[in-house]
Curated annotation (Swiss-Prot):
Pathway: Bacterial outer membrane biogenesis; LOS core biosynthesis. It comes from Campylobacter jejuni subsp. jejuni serotype O:2 (strain ATCC 700819 / NCTC 11168). GO terms for molecular function: ADP-heptose-lipopolysaccharide heptosyltransferase activity. This is Lipooligosaccharide heptosyltransferase 2. Glycosyltransferase involved in the biosynthesis of the core oligosaccharide region of lipooligosaccharide (LOS). Catalyzes the addition of the second heptose unit to the heptosyl-Kdo2-lipid A module. It catalyses: an L-alpha-D-Hep-(1->5)-[alpha-Kdo-(2->4)]-alpha-Kdo-(2->6)-lipid A + ADP-L-glycero-beta-D-manno-heptose = an L-alpha-D-Hep-(1->3)-L-alpha-D-Hep-(1->5)-[alpha-Kdo-(2->4)]-alpha-Kdo-(2->6)-lipid A + ADP + H(+). It comes from the Bacteria. The gene is waaF. PANTHER family: ADP-HEPTOSE--LPS HEPTOSYLTRANSFERASE 2 (PTHR30160:SF7), TETRAACYLDISACCHARIDE 4'-KINASE-RELATED (PTHR30160). Disruption phenotype: Mutant synthesizes a truncated LOS molecule. Its EC number is 2.4.99.24. Keywords: Glycosyltransferase, Transferase. It is an enzyme of class 2 (transferase). The keyword Cell cycle does not apply. Can complement a S.typhimurium mutant lacking waaF.
């Protein structure tokens, strides 16, 4: 059997889709999988068993689909984890026998992990037994970037792909790092031009204070990003893809929420995570930039609140 899967676009969504993907894998143990999607989503599942990885060409996706129809031949089942109309066209071009499409308007108030699981359960008329986040990477827990002085590692992730509204202030991240700098060395994570500026700002603030810090922005692959986050003793992050990676590895995490719904995208089943957010009337707006122009959901969320939650995590030895 040959199964085509159109993965979610974003890193975090793809992580949250992992229980659903492994549910399909469990149900069709001997199937061959074609995993199709963005660079980050396909990189995340590059080592998925018995699979062929195809990166979507967004500039000519329909022409690509026509070529794939000839290359792949008969496809028995296809699942689109995207609700975009383009995904429907692609699966139509491939002429899959049975096609199933994720509907983002179903189960609107459920966590995103459950939305994806219900999609597969309803499509295949099965009950999912696997509900844990899982990635196919086999990580080596010997980090080549360890700062080698006996200190623990604090990871900072100041970026977020959805838009600037999700990003906590760089100076706030730096203040948190300064608070823990006696006991932790600092790793800064990020990707892309906008995040590079944030990461550089934090890096400069810390270097001026003679804090030991490594800026890994745009210096990791998806696999080494997973490796480094898994190695952290504490992780401070916005609502983002790396936040969901930290949930996979049960890293002690303080997750900062502003405009997004933490009930739907919180770190899934990570008992080592604490959520920090305000309760403003305008939250959650779900906008890329603040429509009210004040961005109070993030600006009024002061570093002291994050520091307090981080200290609570660290002092609870059972975590």
């Amino acid at each position: 059997m040959k199964i085509f899967i159109h993965l979610p676009t974003w890193l975090g969504d793809t992580v949250m889709a992992s229980p659903a993907l492994y549910t399909i894998k469990e149900h069709f143990k001997d199937a061959q999988f074609i995993l199709y999607g963005s660079f980050v989503s396909t990189a995340l599942f590059k080592e998925f068993p018995n699979s062929k990885i195809i990166i979507e060409n967004k500039l000519s996706r329909y022409k690509q689909a026509l070529s794939l129809r000839k290359e792949l031949g008969k496809i028995d089942l296809s699942f689109a984890f995207r609700s975009a109309f383009s995904s429907k066209i692609i699966l139509h071009i491939l002429k899959t026998k049975q096609r199933y499409f994720f509907d983002k308007n179903k189960y609107k108030e459920e966590h995103q992990v459950l939305k994806y699981l219900y999609f597969i359960e309803n499509s295949l008329s099965i009950k999912a037994h696997f509900k844990d986040l899982k990635l196919p990477f086999k990580l080596k827990f010997q980090n080549p970037l360890i700062l080698r002085n006996g200190k623990k590692i604090l990871g900072l992730n100041p970026g977020a792909s959805f838009g600037s509204a999700k990003r906590w202030d760089a100076s706030y991240f730096a203040k948190v790092a300064l608070n823990f700098s006696q006991s932790h060395d600092i790793l800064i994570f990020g990707a892309g031009k906008a995040e590079q500026e944030l990461c550089n700002e934090i890096y400069q603030i810390l270097k001026e204070q003679n804090i030991k810090v490594k800026n890994l922005c745009n210096k990791t692959t998806i696999k080494t990003l997973c490796q480094n986050i898994a190695f952290c003793d504490l992780f401070i992050t916005n609502d983002s893809g790396p936040m969901h990676l930290s949930a996979v590895y049960k890293v002690k995490t303080v997750a900062i929420f502003g405009p997004t719904k933490f009930t739907q995208t919180s770190p899934w089943q990570n008992e080592n995570a604490k959520l920090v957010h305000l309760d403003l009337a305008c939250m959650p707006c779900m906008q890329k930039t603040c429509p009210l122009k004040h961005h109070k959901c993030m600006k009024d969320l002061k570093p002291e609140k994050v520091i307090e939650q981080a200290k609570n995590l660290l002092k609870n030895s059972h975590l």
